């Protein structure tokens, strides 16, 4: 396994998913679901999924996610964009599932919270690029640990209300 390629592959989705929380610092946020409910009467995504967070995640995931490739040339800017937008869409799907299961915003839902963004990102990426299964397995193994650590950091920095 090429560890450099592995890092460069998972970096854009990690940055996209992790930086969306920065929108919590905005006084005014616009929920992606516009406050609308699904047929079950529950919010589609909830207040935690905003246009501001999506755009922050997409831009940082794309550009900061791509930045190491200026030196190493493994991924293109388009690759970083695809990995980032797919990660954010995967996170939205996870929020949709959590609302259907009556889980409140911020409620820990292992492994949904930890893997939705990454697996969606890698699945979409494999539609046009080959990824060895060993990279996917390695990402699934290390992501919950990295997710927990980064969530605690975000909590202590007061970017998140819960440490999970």
Curated annotation (Swiss-Prot):
It catalyses: 2,3-bis-O-(geranylgeranyl)-sn-glycerol 1-phosphate + CTP + H(+) = CDP-2,3-bis-O-(geranylgeranyl)-sn-glycerol + diphosphate. One of its GO terms (cellular component) is plasma membrane. The chain crosses the membrane at residues 3-23, 51-71, 77-97, 122-142. Its cofactor is Mg(2+). Pfam families: CarS-like. GO terms for biological process: glycerophospholipid biosynthetic process. It is a multi-pass membrane protein. It comes from the Archaea. The keyword Lipid metabolism applies. Keywords: Cell membrane, Lipid biosynthesis, Lipid metabolism, Magnesium, Membrane, Phospholipid biosynthesis, Phospholipid metabolism, Transferase, Transmembrane, Transmembrane helix. One of its GO terms (molecular function) is CDP-2,3-bis-(O-geranylgeranyl)-sn-glycerol synthase activity. It is found in: Cell membrane. InterPro entries: CarS, CarS_archaea. Its EC number is 2.7.7.67. Pathway: Membrane lipid metabolism; glycerophospholipid metabolism. Catalyzes the formation of CDP-2,3-bis-(O-geranylgeranyl)-sn-glycerol (CDP-archaeol) from 2,3-bis-(O-geranylgeranyl)-sn-glycerol 1-phosphate (DGGGP) and CTP. This reaction is the third ether-bond-formation step in the biosynthesis of archaeal membrane lipids. PANTHER family: CDP-ARCHAEOL SYNTHASE. Belongs to the CDP-archaeol synthase family. This is CDP-archaeol synthase. It comes from Pyrobaculum islandicum (strain DSM 4184 / JCM 9189 / GEO3).
């Amino acid at each position: 396994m090429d560890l450099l390629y592995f890092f460069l592959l998972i970096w854009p989705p990690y940055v996209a998913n992790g930086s969306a929380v920065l929108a919590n610092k905005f006084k005014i946020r616009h929920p992606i679901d516009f406050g609308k409910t699904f047929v079950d009467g529950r919010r589609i995504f909830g207040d935690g999924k905003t246009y501001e967070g999506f755009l922050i995640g997409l831009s940082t995931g794309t550009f900061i996610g791509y930045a190491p490739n200026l030196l190493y040339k493994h991924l293109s800017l388009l690759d970083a964009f695809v990995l980032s937008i797919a990660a954010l869409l995967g996170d939205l799907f996870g929020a949709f599932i959590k609302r259907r299961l009556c889980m409140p915003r911020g409620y820990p839902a292992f492994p949904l919270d930890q893997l939705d963004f990454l697996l969606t990102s890698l699945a979409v990426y494999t539609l046009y690029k080959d990824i060895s299964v060993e990279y996917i397995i390695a990402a699934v193994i290390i992501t919950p640990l990295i997710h927990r650590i980064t969530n605690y950091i975000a909590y202590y920095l007061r970017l998140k209300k819960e440490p999970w």
